Amino acid sequence: LFYTSLSPNHLNVYIDVNHYYADKKRALFFIKNNEIYFINNLDNIIGIKDNQFEIKIDFIKEIKKYLQGEFSCKYANIAMNYCLNKGFSKEELLNRLITLKPVKYRLNKVFENKQFIFINDSKSTTSNSSKYCFETFSDRPRILILGGKHKSNKFNIKINDNDLVLIYGIDKNIINKEINGLLFNNLEEIMKYIKTLKNNYYVLFSPGCDSHDQYKSFIDRGNHFNELINIYFKYE
């Protein structure tokens, strides 16, 4: 099973959109049979050769015990139903769910106390992924942390009156023109500010930008976020 989105969110590493699509196409050369499925959106499953794919069982409720995020759960549901079509039993697949691990720093809940729930989404390098994170956690006020090297795609996120946007990094002024927030030089300044707040919040670290202005990678950035949680919140 091969599935991918065809949304050009990472054009900063490509010459243009045509090179982006060509790179996606090259992945097909690693498929060893002709049973290939493209998923460009969740309502449009395009099959090649074997066009009998169908969603037989909705595993979403079980999947949500192990994964965060609407699309992550729906993609996992599609993969599990593909396996059903290939002869795996429902019991086998449910047993495998126990071993399912989320992608590192993609919507990871890393700490919770009486006031804050911290979500580490450092893998977020586009405005679309920040928007997805923001909309995934919506049952309490949210603090959205953005920052880094801004890409060409603009931030188009609807912020409520009880939400906060905190922006840091080299392109904080550019980001602030697209989504108004409070400006900081670095992530540690933001964590110190959050420490002064009194209300209950989700703290969503979903930068929506490239990490290389202050970090080696999104993993380095995510590690630093966790370290700051330990320093300022975990041992209160």
Predicted regions and their residues:
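Residue-level signal for inorganic ion chemistry
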Residues: 1, 20, 75, 79, ...
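Short internal beta-strands
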Residues: 2, 37-41, 145-147, 161-172
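C-terminal helical cap/extension that packs against the catalytic core
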Residues: 150-202
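Active-site regions of enzymes building and remodeling cell-envelope glycoconjugates
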Residues: 1, 45-65, 162-165, 177-190
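Glycine/aspartate-rich loop-and-adjacent alpha/beta segment that forms the canonical ThDP
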Residues: 207-235
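Nucleotide phosphate-binding/pyrophosphate-handling subdomain across enzymes
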Residues: 63-163
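Short glycine-rich anion-binding loops that position phosphate/pyrophosphate groups of nucleotides
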Residues: 8-9, 42-43, 125, 148-151, ...
